[in-house]
Amino acid sequence: MDTFITRNFQTTIIQKAKNTMAEFSEDPELQPAMLFNICVHLEVCYVISDMNFLDEEGKSYTALEGQGKEQNLRPQYEVIEGMPRTIAWMVQRSLAQEHGIETPKYLADLFDYKTKRFIEVGITKGLADDYFWKKKEKLGNSMELMIFSYNQDYSLSNESSLDEEGKGRVLSRLTELQAELSLKNLWQVLIGEEDVEKGIDFKLGQTISRLRDISVPAGFSNFEGMRSYIDNIDPKGAIERNLARMSPLVSATPKKLKWEDLRPIGPHIYNHELPEVPYNAFLLMSDELGLANMTEGKSKKPKTLAKECLEKYSTLRDQTDPILIMKSEKANENFLWKLWRDCVNTISNEEMSNELQKTNYAKWATGDGLTYQKIMKEVAIDDETMCQEEPKIPNKCRVAAWVQTEMNLLSTLTSKRALDLPEIGPDVAPVEHVGSERRKYFVNEINYCKASTVMMKYVLFHTSLLNESNASMGKYKVIPITNRVVNEKGESFDMLYGLAVKGQSHLRGDTDVVTVVTFEFSSTDPRVDSGKWPKYTVFRIGSLFVSGREKSVYLYCRVNGTNKIQMKWGMEARRCLLQSMQQMEAIVEQESSIQGYDMTKACFKGDRVNSPKTFSIGTQEGKLVKGSFGKALRVIFTKCLMHYVFGNAQLEGFSAESRRLLLLIQALKDRKGPWVFDLEGMYSGIEECISNNPWVIQSAYWFNEWLGFEKEGSKVLESVDEIMDE
């Protein structure tokens, strides 16, 4: 770690960091992680200061804009961090006195000459918003906050205090440091170093050692014996060895594969006697309705945001006589409506807490007290009525039109964007110009794609849900389903899509389930496609005027559940961006290598030589539909999002099993003459996974369409070959 710090930070920064540690009687050699954290904090403060300047009239300039005017410029930010504490306090008091403001109770990191405000800079390895509110509770409004995370997100109390270039530089530097640390296996050293009590090394006493020894699993006599077994175990090779012993008993007859041998997968998806596959995503997507409230773009607590939105739409908030439109099989509509009214009242009151009372209807909705009772094995053996439940096999469903409609709507362009990506610094090397140009085209397409708004809603909601599940395990909490969007004019809007209720969440294991009741707004009448909504209870709660037309507003209610793994994946849903962009960039790179120059613009817009690139993005009336490069990018991005939203064991199995079939088809297209054995067994493995997952069923439907086109194409090629032979 010492070598890493020396190589990655300037000598002056390291020296100041060591001086800071010395003031608190800390040894840099014993606490290298603390030295690293102080160096990072100092460097971020200097990056912010070095990027922003003021002229004599108080006008702001970035470092780039101020080139050639250096004599008339002065730094916008005074760096207080890194000074000896006595001098730092003296500087802080004199700045406060000079500008006629109150001296903060805590020592600040920066002072902004433009806004005349002190600033606290924070670096976190967790979520920026979490650390922001932690600091906010401590500092109040005494100073502005700038929080940056290694996770590539940030939270500012004043969005205008730092331009996009400055944010991008800071986040890029943090990413670079994290990558370097990970390469050298030093990143784990820093985990847990942030705002936690220091651990104390102590020798285990006899009692603790004895308790440790008797706590080991059955089959081990003591802890050391178990540790020795784990250290020496060979987890690999056992399956291979057993298979080798079985090889004389296995009989497989290879057969050369032909196009005629391939058939559509999952024939039951066309069976009209089966029910349509129902909508089972965690939150509404294309059917969502957000209550919009214009805002200045500052960070807000979710409860404040939800309260302001509900106040603007008071007719919906105060509705007490709903009309029941649809009821799910097991729902109690009266209990659900009472719970919704409790949620609204909790959000609307003046208290800071968003805790719900444990009423009988709240307990019913969250399943409180309905968990299985654990019984000792000895008791179960003696009781004849105790037996293992039969495994529940998912019911088969047929393909539904709503999946394709969702896909079409989510891949369209809208007038609003919710995607929050950090800006990057100015280009230096020629290859960076290419990267920036490519990024610009990609982001322009994705930014205003409906799917990116839905993705950010999922990210924010799952972040809040996981935080509340960990922080308030025994309490019922109301969690607003929110987002923030920016329109084409640059105006920010807070969006409230509904409210959710979290039940008790004593999640010891990653797969332990927490009940979540969701109440979401929509303008979609569920009776139009009733087969889509069997899991929902729907009320009509009023109407809104949109573009001069009155639209009914419906409240979609559902009792659902999730676990830690799903919540963590929800927080990282931004990963959908990477796969779609990498896939399209590979095509651009391939075209560029053929043409000998960067083809980014040519692929998206065309140039003097090449017309814009098009792709097959679907079918209509049995014919392939072509779309632009940008449309193809949005379609792939939307598919990645749907893959996350509907991800479960069925989808994992279908993806893995169908990959083999795709490889066989590719081999047939390349005329490599593939050989197979037990083709029907492979089909059986694929069809076992096609039950009631909407995305799996739709993927099977698309696969069958594509297989039909490929078969037709192969017949054309065969006829051409015959003509050539003659």
UniProtKB/Swiss-Prot annotation:
Needed cofactors: Mn(2+)
Keyword annotations from UniProtKB, A to Z: Cap snatching, Endonuclease, Eukaryotic host gene expression shutoff by virus, Eukaryotic host transcription shutoff by virus, Host cytoplasm, Host gene expression shutoff by virus, Host nucleus, Host-virus interaction, Hydrolase, Inhibition of host RNA polymerase II by virus, Manganese, Metal-binding, Nuclease, Phosphoprotein
EC number: 3.1.-.-
GO cellular component terms, A-Z: host cell cytoplasm; host cell nucleus
Entry's Gene Ontology BP terms: cap snatching; DNA-templated transcription; symbiont-mediated suppression of host gene expression; symbiont-mediated suppression of host mRNA transcription via inhibition of RNA polymerase II activity; viral RNA genome replication; viral translational frameshifting
Residues that bind Mn(2+) 2: E81, D109
Compartments (UniProt record): Host cytoplasm; Host nucleus
Source taxon at top rank: Viruses
Motif (Nuclear localization signal 2 (NLS2)): 183-244
InterPro entries: INFV_PA, PA/PA-X, PA/PA-X_sf
Short sequence motif named Nuclear localization signal 1 (NLS1), residue ranges: 125-140
Residues given in the record as Mn(2+) 1 binding sites: H41, D109, E120, V121
Enzyme superclass (EC): hydrolase
Modification comment: Phosphorylated on serines and threonines by host kinases, including human casein kinase II.
GO molecular function per UniProt: endonuclease activity; metal ion binding; RNA binding
Main location class: host cell
Cofactor, free-text remark: Binds 2 manganese ions per subunit.
Family that this chain belongs to: Belongs to the influenza viruses PA family.
Subunit and partners: Influenza RNA polymerase is composed of three subunits: PB1, PB2 and PA. Interacts (via C-terminus) with PB1 (via N-terminus).
Function: Plays an essential role in viral RNA transcription and replication by forming the heterotrimeric polymerase complex together with PB1 and PB2 subunits. The complex transcribes viral mRNAs by using a unique mechanism called cap-snatching. It consists in the hijacking and cleavage of host capped pre-mRNAs. These short capped RNAs are then used as primers for viral mRNAs. The PB2 subunit is responsible for the binding of the 5' cap of cellular pre-mRNAs which are subsequently cleaved after 10-13 nucleotides by the PA subunit that carries the endonuclease activity.
Protein name from the UniProt record: Polymerase acidic protein
Organism (species): Influenza B virus (strain B/Panama/45/1990)
Organism placement in taxonomy: Viruses, Riboviria, Orthornavirae, Negarnaviricota, Polyploviricotina
